[in-house]
C-alpha cells in the first residue's frame, strides 16, 4: 500500500429527500415490531403480571378481560402481582394484629388471670413473636414465594408436615372470615337492635368489593384501617394516663395510681396464669401475614426488613403499655368485664365509661368495629393466598392455582368469599338456640392450635435453613436480610411455642371454674390430633422423606444480595458500631 493511499479524500454518500423519508419510515416500522417484544418481557419479570392495559377497549370489556388467566407467570411459578408497597407492609406489620385480641380478648385474660398475669404473659409472648418475625423476615427476603412460610415448611422440614400445617392454617382463617362477620354485627348491638343479618350483608359486600380490586386494594384498605387503629390506641394510652392521674373532671375516683393492681394482681393461681399465656398467644395471630405477602411485595429486600423492625414497637407500645394501663384502671372482678358475666364490654371501652366520659365509649366501639373489619379483610386475603400456595405445591386441587390478569388467585378467592355466607347461621339463634356458637366453636377447634404449629414451623425452618446454608458453604453476606438473633433466637421461639402447646393442653384438660370434661378438652385441643391425622395421611400417600442438610435444596428461588453494604461507610469508633447494630435491629 503506497503512502498516497492514506491521503485519499473521504467519500460521502448522498441521499435524496425521497430516500431519507423511506429510511425514516422503515425505522419507525422496525420500532413498532420491537415494542411488542418488550411488552412480552415484562410478563416474565419475577412475580409480576403485565400492567399494560389493552387500548381501545371500554371499561366493561376490560373488566371481564381481567378475569381471564394471566398470560405468563413469574419464576416462582405463579402470576401474583407485586403491588404491595413498603408503606403497606409497615402498616400491616404495625396494625395487623391490633384487633379483637387486644381490644376484646384482653378482657377475658384480665378476668381469668389478673393484671399481673396479663402484663407478664403478653410481654413473654411479645418476645417470642419478636424472634419469630425476624426469622420469618430473613427467609421471606431470601425466598419471596407464593405460600410463604407454609412453602418453607414443605421445603425445609417435610412435605407431609407442610401439608398438615398449611391445611390447618387455611382452615383457621377460612372459618375466621364468617365468624368475624358475625362479630361485626354483634358489635353494632352497642347502639342498635337492627337485625344482625343486615350488618352481615353490608360487610360481606364490602369485603367482596375490596377483593375484586386485587392485592393493591387489600393493601390500601389495611393501610387506612391500621392507621385508624394506631391513632386510636395512641389516643387511649394518653387518655388512660390522664384518667389514672385523676385528671378527668367527670371521674370522681380521683388519683388511682396502683391501688387496683395491688388489690389482686393474680387470679385463679397457676391455672389462670396458663390460661392468659395461651390467650395472649392467640392475640398476636396475624403477625405472620407479612411473610405470606412476600410474593406480592414490590422490592421485598427493602420493604420486608422495615416491616419486621416495626414489630418491636408494636409489641412494646400498643400491647405492653396499653395493657399495663388497663391493669391500672380496671379491676379483674368487674362484673362488666368480658369473662365475668352475661353483659360483656371491652376493657378499653369500660375504662372510658368508668371515667364518666360521655360520647367517647361510642367512638372507641367504632374503633373496635374497624379492627374487626380489618381482621375480616386479612382473613380473606390469608385464606385465599394459602389455598393458592398449596395448589402450587400440589397439596390442594390444581384449579386453585388459577390466577387472573390482575394477579388475583380467583378460584381460591371465590371459595373463601362464598364461605362468608356461612355467617348467616347466626339467624338460627333467634329461637333461643346457640346453634351458631356451637358450630363456630367446633369449626375453630379443628384449627385452634394453628398459630403454634405455624410459628413453631417458622422457627424450625429457619434453624434448618441456617444449618444447611452453612453446611453447603454459603455466607450470610449473600442474604438481603439477616436476623440478628440468629439460630438461637429461633430456638427460643420454638421453645416458647412448645410451652404454649403444653399450657393449652393443661387449660383444656383442667378448665377454669370447672372439672375435666371431654367437651372442653376437645374444643381446646382437637387441632392436635387433626393435624397429626393430616400429617400421617399425607405421609402414607406421598411417602416423602426428610433430606439431609448437605442435600437440601436451598438454591432454587434463592435471592442473593452479595456485597450489599459495600457502599455504606463503616463506623469508625466502637460506640458508633454498637449504636448502628442496635438501631439496625429496631429501626
Curated annotation (Swiss-Prot):
**Entry keywords, A to Z:** Amino-acid transport, Cell membrane, Membrane, Phosphoprotein, Transmembrane, Transmembrane helix, Transport
Q: Which residues carry this modification: Phosphoserine?
A: 29-30, 37
What's the domain of life for this entry? Eukaryota
Family per record: Belongs to the amino acid-polyamine-organocation (APC) superfamily.
Which organism is the protein's source?
A: Schizosaccharomyces pombe (strain 972 / ATCC 24843)
- Topological domains, Cytoplasmic: 1-90, 137-158, 215-222, 294-310, 376-405, 466-491, 542-580
Q: Does the keyword Transmembrane helix apply?
A: yes
- Entry's transmembrane regions: 91-111, 116-136, 159-179, 194-214, 223-243, 273-293, 311-331, 355-375, 406-426, 445-465, 492-512, 521-541
For this protein, the record's PROSITE patterns field holds: AMINO_ACID_PERMEASE_1
Task: Write down the membrane topology.
Answer: Multi-pass membrane protein
A GO molecular-function term, please? L-lysine transmembrane transporter activity
Name of the protein described by the UniProt record: Cationic amino acid transporter 1
Instruction: List the gene name.
Output: cat1
**Which residue stretches are annotated as topological domain Extracellular?**
112-115, 180-193, 244-272, 332-354, 427-444, 513-520
Per UniProt, what is one Pfam family of this protein?
AA_permease
Localized where? Cell membrane; Cell tip
GO terms for biological process? amino acid transmembrane transport; L-arginine import across plasma membrane; L-lysine import across plasma membrane
* Knockout consequences: Leads to a dramatic decrease in the uptake of arginine or lysine and resistance to canavanine and thialysine.
Which PANTHER family does the record cross-reference, listed alphabetically?
A: AMINO ACID PERMEASE (PTHR43341), GENERAL AMINO-ACID PERMEASE GAP1 (PTHR43341:SF1)
Function of the molecule: Major permease specifically involved in arginine and lysine uptake.
Alphabetical GO CC annotations of the entry are: cell division site; medial membrane band; membrane; plasma membrane; plasma membrane of cell tip
Amino acid at each position: 500500500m503506497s503512502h498516497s493511499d492514506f491521503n485519499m479524500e473521504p467519500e460521502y454518500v448522498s441521499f435524496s429527500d425521497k430516500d431519507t423519508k423511506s429510511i425514516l419510515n422503515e425505522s419507525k416500522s422496525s420500532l413498532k415490531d420491537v415494542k411488542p417484544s418488550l411488552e412480552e418481557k415484562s410478563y416474565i419479570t419475577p412475580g409480576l403480571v403485565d400492567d399494560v392495559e389493552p387500548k381501545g377497549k371500554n371499561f366493561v370489556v376490560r373488566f371481564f378481560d381481567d378475569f381471564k388467566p394471566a398470560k405468563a407467570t413469574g419464576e416462582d411459578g405463579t402470576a401474583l402481582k407485586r403491588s404491595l408497597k413498603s408503606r403497606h407492609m409497615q402498616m400491616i406489620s404495625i396494625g395487623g394484629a391490633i384487633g379483637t385480641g387486644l381490644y376484646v380478648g384482653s378482657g377475658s385474660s384480665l378476668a381469668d388471670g389478673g393484671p399481673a398475669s396479663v402484663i407478664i404473659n403478653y410481654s413473654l409472648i411479645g418476645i417470642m413473636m419478636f424472634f419469630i418475625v425476624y426469622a420469618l423476615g430473613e427467609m421471606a427476603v431470601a425466598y419471596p414465594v407464593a405460600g410463604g412460610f407454609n412453602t418453607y415448611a414443605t421445603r425445609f422440614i417435610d412435605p407431609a408436615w407442610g401439608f398438615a400445617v398449611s391445611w390447618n392454617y387455611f382452615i383457621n382463617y377460612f372459618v375466621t372470615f364468617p365468624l368475624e362477620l358475625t362479630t361485626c354485627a354483634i358489635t353494632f348491638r352497642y347502639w342498635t337492635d337492627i337485625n344482625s343479618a343486615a350488618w352481615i350483608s353490608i360487610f360481606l359486600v364490602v369485603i367482596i368489593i375490596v377483593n375484586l380490586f386485587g392485592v393493591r386494594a387489600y393493601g390500601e384498605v389495611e393501610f387506612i384501617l391500621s392507621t385508624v387503629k394506631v391513632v386510636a390506641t395512641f389516643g387511649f394510652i394518653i387518655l388512660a394516663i390522664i384518667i389514672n392521674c385523676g385528671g378527668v373532671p367527670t371521674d370522681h375516683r380521683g388519683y388511682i395510681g396502683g391501688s387496683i393492681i395491688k388489690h389482686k394482681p393474680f387470679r385463679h393461681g397457676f391455672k389462670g396464669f396458663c390460661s392468659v399465656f395461651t390467650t395472649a398467644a392467640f392475640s398476636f395471630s396475624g403477625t405472620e401475614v407479612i411473610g405470606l405477602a412476600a410474593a406480592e411485595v414490590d422490592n421485598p429486600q427493602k420493604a420486608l426488613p422495615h416491616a419486621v423492625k416495626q414489630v418491636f414497637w408494636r409489641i412494646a407500645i400498643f400491647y405492653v403499655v396499653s395493657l399495663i394501663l388497663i391493669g391500672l384502671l380496671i379491676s379483674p372482678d368487674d362484673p362488666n368485664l368480658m369473662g365475668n358475666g352475661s353483659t360483656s364490654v371491652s376493657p378499653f371501652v369500660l375504662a372510658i365509661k368508668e371515667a364518666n366520659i360521655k360520647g367517647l365509649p361510642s367512638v372507641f366501639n367504632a374503633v373496635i368495629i374497624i379492627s374487626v373489619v380489618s381482621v375480616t379483610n386479612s382473613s380473606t386475603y390469608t385464606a385465599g393466598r394459602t389455598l393458592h400456595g398449596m395448589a402450587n405445591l400440589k397439596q390442594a386441587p390444581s384449579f386453585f392455582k388459577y390466577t387472573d390478569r390482575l394477579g388475583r388467585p380467583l378460584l381460591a378467592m371465590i371459595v373463601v368469599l362464598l364461605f362468608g355466607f356461612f355467617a348467616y347461621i347466626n339467624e338460627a339463634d333467634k329461637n333461643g338456640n346457640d346453634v351458631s356458637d356451637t358450630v363456630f366453636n367446633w369449626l375453630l377447634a379443628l384449627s385452634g392450635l394453628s398459630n403454634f404449629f405455624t410459628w413453631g414451623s417458622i422457627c424450625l425452618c429457619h434453624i434448618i435453613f441456617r444449618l444447611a446454608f452453612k453446611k453447603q458453604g454459603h455466607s450470610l453476606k449473600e442474604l438481603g436480610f439477616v436476623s440478628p438473633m440468629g439460630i438461637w433466637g429461633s430456638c427460643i421461639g420454638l421453645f416458647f411455642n412448645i410451652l404454649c402447646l403444653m399450657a393449652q393442653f393443661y387449660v383444656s384438660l383442667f378448665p377454669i371454674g370447672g372439672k375435666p370434661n371431654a367437651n372442653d378438652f376437645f374444643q381446646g385441643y382437637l387441632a392436635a390430633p387433626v393435624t397429626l391425622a393430616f400429617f400421617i395421611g399425607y405421609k402414607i400417600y406421598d411417602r416423602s422423606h426428610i433430606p439431609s442438610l448437605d442435600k437440601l435444596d436451598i438454591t432454587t428461588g434463592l435471592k442473593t444480595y452479595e456485597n450489599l453494604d459495600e457502599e455504606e461507610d463503616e463506623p469508625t469508633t466502637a460506640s458508633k458500631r454498637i449504636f448502628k447494630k442496635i438501631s439496625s435491629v429496631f429501626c
